[in-house]
């Protein structure tokens, strides 16, 4: 907002200065044209004066005026007689005297003066007489008009320069050093995991309960805690549980009397770490899943219920090794 106000002040000050200069030139030309209109009448009356009086008239006309004198061939007695007469020149002096102070400061003689004297080819032209003394009073009427104008001009550019100070050329940005990549932190090793397999019927079918019960018992599972089947260290059910088998359908429990029972599949899971060698327990778990799938006519799936692949089996083994290393 302040910069907008400063720009407005600068523009207003410049317009004021231009208006003053145009007005001064216009006034000067107007006064000069009026002086040239009055001068022929004065010259007609000054022809009767002698050469000495003509020089006095030149002093009254101001700086840089060109005077044209006609050679006077009259007798000397006639000149003396004319010199005794009162000079009519003083009757026309006030108009010139009043017009001189209104001339502009340091106005050089323009080229318009010689064409006005051109119609008199037979008259000799004298050199212009420069009188510096009248210059001092000529500056007085002009100074009060020009002096107040520069005040807003000198005060306004100072904040304008300050406004453009931020526009200084900015040094080219130095290339930033490339940060070295931070060392990749090793993923923290897991200390426990759950290995999951599924035995499911083919698409659109279900596993028969009686057939499923026989295959589960043949694989060494025993019905126990949480109403699900567990595979213990010993086939007779003694020792710690190595892995367990649950129903794929929530809540995941079984009924031991499931002759009329059907299900889309069962889930076998093993918690790692576990008792004994986890890799050996995993092999036993995979063998049990394949035995049940073969007996009921199903397929073995991974934890995402996709077809089990050798890559997925290696992934399970890597997880088991990672947990073992973390708990070593």
UniProtKB/Swiss-Prot annotation:
<dbReference type="InterPro" id="IPR036765">
    <property type="entry name" value="ZipA_FtsZ-bd_C_sf"/>
</dbReference>
<keyword id="KW-0132">Cell division</keyword>
<dbReference type="InterPro" id="IPR011919">
    <property type="entry name" value="Cell_div_ZipA"/>
</dbReference>
<comment type="function">
    <text>Essential cell division protein that stabilizes the FtsZ protofilaments by cross-linking them and that serves as a cytoplasmic membrane anchor for the Z ring. Also required for the recruitment to the septal ring of downstream cell division proteins.</text>
</comment>
<keyword id="KW-0131">Cell cycle</keyword>
<keyword id="KW-0997">Cell inner membrane</keyword>
<keyword id="KW-0812">Transmembrane</keyword>
<dbReference type="GO" id="GO:0000917">
    <property type="term" value="P:division septum assembly"/>
</dbReference>
<keyword id="KW-1133">Transmembrane helix</keyword>
<feature type="region of interest" description="Disordered">
    <location>
        <begin position="42"/>
        <end position="186"/>
    </location>
</feature>
<dbReference type="InterPro" id="IPR007449">
    <property type="entry name" value="ZipA_FtsZ-bd_C"/>
</dbReference>
<feature type="compositionally biased region" description="Low complexity">
    <location>
        <begin position="123"/>
        <end position="171"/>
    </location>
</feature>
<feature type="topological domain" description="Periplasmic">
    <location>
        <begin position="1"/>
        <end position="6"/>
    </location>
</feature>
<feature type="compositionally biased region" description="Low complexity">
    <location>
        <begin position="99"/>
        <end position="115"/>
    </location>
</feature>
<dbReference type="GO" id="GO:0032153">
    <property type="term" value="C:cell division site"/>
</dbReference>
<feature type="compositionally biased region" description="Acidic residues">
    <location>
        <begin position="51"/>
        <end position="63"/>
    </location>
</feature>
<protein>
    <recommendedName>
        <fullName>Cell division protein ZipA</fullName>
    </recommendedName>
</protein>
<feature type="topological domain" description="Cytoplasmic">
    <location>
        <begin position="28"/>
        <end position="328"/>
    </location>
</feature>
<keyword id="KW-0472">Membrane</keyword>
<dbReference type="GO" id="GO:0005886">
    <property type="term" value="C:plasma membrane"/>
</dbReference>
<comment type="similarity">
    <text>Belongs to the ZipA family.</text>
</comment>
<feature type="transmembrane region" description="Helical">
    <location>
        <begin position="7"/>
        <end position="27"/>
    </location>
</feature>
<comment type="subunit">
    <text>Interacts with FtsZ via their C-terminal domains.</text>
</comment>
<keyword id="KW-1003">Cell membrane</keyword>
<dbReference type="GO" id="GO:0043093">
    <property type="term" value="P:FtsZ-dependent cytokinesis"/>
</dbReference>
<dbReference type="Pfam" id="PF04354">
    <property type="entry name" value="ZipA_C"/>
</dbReference>
């Amino acid at each position: 907002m302040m910069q907008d106000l400063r720009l407005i002040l600068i523009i207003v000050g410049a317009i004021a200065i231009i208006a003053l200069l145009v007005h001064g030139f216009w006034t000067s030309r107007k006064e000069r044209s009026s002086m040239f209109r009055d001068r022929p009448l004065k010259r007609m009356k000054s022809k009767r004066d002698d050469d000495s009086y003509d020089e006095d008239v030149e002093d009254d006309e101001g700086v840089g005026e060109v005077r044209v004198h006609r050679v006077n061939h009259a007798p000397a007695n006639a000149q003396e007689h004319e010199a005794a007469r009162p000079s009519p020149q003083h009757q026309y002096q006030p108009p010139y005297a009043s017009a001189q102070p209104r001339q502009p400061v340091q106005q050089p003689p323009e080229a318009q003066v010689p064409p006005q004297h051109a119609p008199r080819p037979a008259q000799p032209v004298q050199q212009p007489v420069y009188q510096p003394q009248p210059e001092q009073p000529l500056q007085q009427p002009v100074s009060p008009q020009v002096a107040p104008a520069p005040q807003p001009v000198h005060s306004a550019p100072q904040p304008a320069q300050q406004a453009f100070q931020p526009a200084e050329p900015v040094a080219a940005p130095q290339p930033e050093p490339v940060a070295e990549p931070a060392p990749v932190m090793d993923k923290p090793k897991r200390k426990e995991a759950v290995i999951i397999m599924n035995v499911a019927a083919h698409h659109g079918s279900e596993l028969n309960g009686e057939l499923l019960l026989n295959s589960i018992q043949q694989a060494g599972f025993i019905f126990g805690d949480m109403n699900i089947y567990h595979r213990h260290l010993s086939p007779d059910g003694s020792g710690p549980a190595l892995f367990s088998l649950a129903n794929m359908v929530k809540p995941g429990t079984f009924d031991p009397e499931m002759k009329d029972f059907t299900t889309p599949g069962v889930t076998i899971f093993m918690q790692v770490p576990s008792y004994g060698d986890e890799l050996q327990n995993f092999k036993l778990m995979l063998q049990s899943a394949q035995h049940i799938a073969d007996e009921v006519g199903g397929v073995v799936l991974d934890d995402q219920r996709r077809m089990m692949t050798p890559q997925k089996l290696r992934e399970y083994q890597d997880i088991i090794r990672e947990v073992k290393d973390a708990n070593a």
